[in-house]
């Protein structure tokens, strides 16, 4: 399996330094990619980089995932228009442990193979580095003219923000450059990879190695992932789509992928899964024959949800989706945990009802007309119930005056009323 060819057909290759492909074809290469540790979870904006490390290891090379502990304390101006919040060491260590756990789902850190993945943290070699040593050993090799020529620096100096660029952020490219030098000297690392906005920082590292060691190293970057409509990938109205279920439930994670556009699904299934080329081509052809069946989106959502979470979480997400969009049963509704239930019915009208009244028993007609405005009138409700068009917790309401009690509550708190095929209402007992 050819690593560069793999990235190329998947649409994961932007820039590549001359000689990189030849090196990868000639020997087992140690390569690294930096990961920002400013949160204790990765989000899907990190996934392209993580998949590059995964493909690298699958092709027989050795991946190093570099946690930017030292650089995370400073902030990188690349692609940013403002200063970053700085982190303390305790937070960084916690974030590192959480991120490694997530990376272990994609990379083999445990086996004894020569290309076993490693996690490194640049704080470990930067924390004892004095300013004087850094200036002497690193600073003298790179000119200010060279640093000023970088696009990321130019953008910040010439941008609309009037706060300019701090010295701290200006020196970021030297710190990242030193990471490459350190890994070259200690791990034999000859290749750095990253997002296309990192090209300037990566080439600074290659230049530093050339000037200090006379060594030749290489670089490649992946393109910025966008949406077909030009919007930012991985962002929703409620923020990032996280890999940690504490921040983004597996159901919401699954729904994100399921709801991407046709053109995005065709690109994303190459980037965010390990499905082989022939199978993807067959899926694309199948999808084009019947786009309304959303075969690409369903397979994409399945693969990524299982990879990030588990098959069990994927199955639960499908079941939860069927409750709103399919022929689900009362049993499948009752299996939902509270967070998923609320996520599934996030957009439906909600009403508060009295728990005390339910404890004594309330007629459905009083509850759904007087207490919660599910129906405009008792006449409308009677007609719909008689026609079999009203369900409570996915079971047909048998009678207009059926008595409802706390025993009917889902999770001891909720009632789900369905009026007709598509109108849902969530009643919350308080």
Swiss-Prot record:
Q: Which cysteines are joined by disulfide bonds?
A: none
Task: Name one matching Pfam family.
Answer: tRNA-synt_1b
Q: Name one GO cellular component term.
A: cytosol
Enzyme Commission number, as recorded = 6.1.1.1
- Motif 'KMSKS' region positions after renumbering to this chain: 232-236
Q: Which Gene3D superfamilies match?
A: HUPs (3.40.50.620), RNA-binding S4 domain (3.10.290.10), Tyrosyl-Transfer RNA Synthetase (1.10.240.10)
Gene Ontology biological process terms, A to Z: tRNA aminoacylation; tyrosyl-tRNA aminoacylation
User: Which positions does the motif 'HIGH' region occupy?
Assistant: 37-46
Q: What is its main location?
A: cytoplasm
Binding residues annotated for ATP, in chain numbering: 235
Q: Which InterPro entries match?
A: aa-tRNA-synth_I_CS (IPR001412), aa-tRNA-synth_Ic (IPR002305), Rossmann-like_a/b/a_fold (IPR014729), S4_RNA-bd_sf (IPR036986), SYY-like_C (IPR054608), Tyr-tRNA-ligase (IPR002307), Tyr-tRNA-ligase_bac-type (IPR024088), Tyr-tRNA-ligase_bac_1 (IPR024107)
Write out the residues that bind L-tyrosine.
32, 172, 176
What CDD domains is this protein classified in?
Answer: TyrRS_core (cd00805)
Which compartments does it reside in? Cytoplasm
Keywords associated with the record: Aminoacyl-tRNA synthetase, ATP-binding, Cytoplasm, Ligase, Nucleotide-binding, Protein biosynthesis, RNA-binding
NCBIfam families recorded = tyrS (TIGR00234)
What family is it from? Belongs to the class-I aminoacyl-tRNA synthetase family. TyrS type 1 subfamily.
Q: What does this protein do?
A: Catalyzes the attachment of tyrosine to tRNA(Tyr) in a two-step reaction: tyrosine is first activated by ATP to form Tyr-AMP and then transferred to the acceptor end of tRNA(Tyr).
Instruction: Name it.
Output: Tyrosine--tRNA ligase
The primary gene name is: tyrS
